[in-house]
């Protein structure tokens, strides 16, 4: 039987300007800010996360697995699976779609 999928929290990465105040931070570091905020807003801890699906428009130069780097920076345990979705403008929406499809099967 399929379970209902709900969004309990949302946060996005900070938006900056080229060579602006956020220039010294990597995309995974900014992702950590978003994950930390989403967890706080939902009232859950990193240990309660089952999977991290995160869109990343331009992963070049970010190192391996930007979603993993972001989740670790937010205190999510290493045992939690992470997926980086590289789909340019649609990566965030694709993350929501994959999460909904994955959860409904369990």
What are these regions (language model features)?
Residues 105-106:
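Conserved small/polar residues in nucleotide/adenosyl-binding loops
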Residues 82-91:
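Active-site nucleophile and cofactor-binding loops and adjacent substrate-binding regions
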Residues 1-80:
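Conserved "HGTGT" condensation-loop signature of ketosynthase/thiolase-family condensing enzymes
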Residues 97:
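Glycine/small-residue-rich loop that forms an oxyanion/phosphate-binding "nest" at active or ligand-binding sites
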């Amino acid at each position: 039987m399929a379970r209902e999928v709900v969004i309990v929290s949302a946060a996005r990465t900070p938006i900056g300007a080229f060579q602006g105040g956020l220039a010294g931070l990597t995309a995974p570091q900014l992702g950590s800010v978003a994950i930390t905020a989403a967890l706080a807003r939902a009232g859950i801890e990193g240990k309660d996360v089952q999977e991290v699906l995160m869109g990343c428009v331009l992963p070049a130069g970010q190192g391996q697995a930007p979603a993993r780097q972001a989740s670790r920076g937010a205190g999510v345990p290493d045992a939690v699976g992470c997926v980086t979705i590289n789909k340019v403008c649609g990566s965030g929406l694709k993350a929501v779609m994959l999460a909904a499809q994955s959860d409904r099967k369990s």
